[in-house]
Regions:
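Long, non-coiled-coil amphipathic alpha-helical linker/lever segments
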Residues: 3-4, 82, 89-140
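Generic structural hydrophobic/aromatic packing signal, biased to beta-strands
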Residues: 7, 17, 32, 42, ...
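Nucleotide-state sensing region of NTPase/ATPase domains
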Residues: 3-77, 83-89, 152-156
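Conserved NTPase motor "head" modules and their coupling/switch loops across ABC/AAA+ ATPases, GTPases
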Residues: 117-203
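Short, surface-exposed, charged/polar-biased interaction segments
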Residues: 28, 74-75, 92, 99-106, ...
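A structural signal for short hydrophobic/aromatic patches embedded in well-ordered alpha helices
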Residues: 81-82, 167
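Conserved NTP-handling cores and scaffolds of large molecular machines
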Residues: 65, 86-93, 104, 111, ...
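Helical mechanochemical/support elements of P-loop NTPase systems and associated helical scaffolds
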Residues: 3, 13, 50, 67, ...
Length: 203
């Protein structure tokens, strides 16, 4: 793992890290002195303190490399992030996701079969898939809207109003605000439009 001495520039004997932060509406000066072969010194408002005394003094937001995948990776990662969060507050949502996966698998099986008698039942599966998909999409949209209320406020606060953030869930309806029924209809129409392409890819 990383060591404190890793902060020392190559060729230098020590490093001195200084910061100013606010705690309970009061500005606090912090300083850390690190020298090779010596104990680290932590100074708060000009007074040397122990490391334990600084725990909880500076509230930080940590960004790990894997967090960037929410932005840099494809929509599947973002959908999974939303689904995981939603399932924690709405356990029933997990059942809907599982049911959707089963219906989707059955639909794909029918397309692969190329059997006329089985393909004749495809529409009933499209209806089920669209209904579940409409519920899932609308639930994700609703959650994202609520999440953004806090996220936008937080970004505004930590950037002192210099940065703004926004996000929008893109669905087949193409609308920002919809109902589960509208999303269901949009998904059903999309399934019908993409039938030939789905058949070609899965066969």
């Amino acid at each position: 793992g990383a060591k404190d001495t890793d902060f020392i520039k190559q060729g230098s004997l020590f490093t001195d890290i200084k910061c100013v932060f606010e705690k309970s509406d009061r500005k606090v000066k912090g300083e850390i002195k690190i020298a090779d072969g010596r104990r680290k010194e932590i100074i708060k408002d000009g007074v040397k303190v122990r490391s334990a005394e600084m725990v909880g003094q500076i509230n930080t937001v940590l960004f790990y490399p894997e967090h960037l995948s929410l932005i840099k990776s494809g929509p599947e990662i973002r959908r999974k992030f939303l689904d995981t969060a939603i399932c924690q507050i709405k356990p029933g949502f997990f059942r809907i996701l599982n049911e959707y996966s089963k219906v989707l698998a059955q639909r794909n099986f029918l397309l692969k079969s190329q059997r006329k008698d089985m393909l004749e039942t495809l529409d009933s599966w499209d209806i089920k898939l669209a209904k579940l998909g409409g519920i899932i999409t609308n639930t994700r949209k609703t959650y994202l809207e609520k999440l953004l209320v806090f996220a936008e406020k937080t970004v505004d606060e930590i950037s002192s109003g210099k940065e703004k953030m926004t996000a929008e869930y893109q669905s087949y309806s193409g609308k920002k605000t919809t109902s589960a029924e509208e999303e269901e209809k949009a998904l059903y129409n999309k399934l019908k439009e993409s039938f030939s392409e789905d058949e070609r890819l899965l066969c």
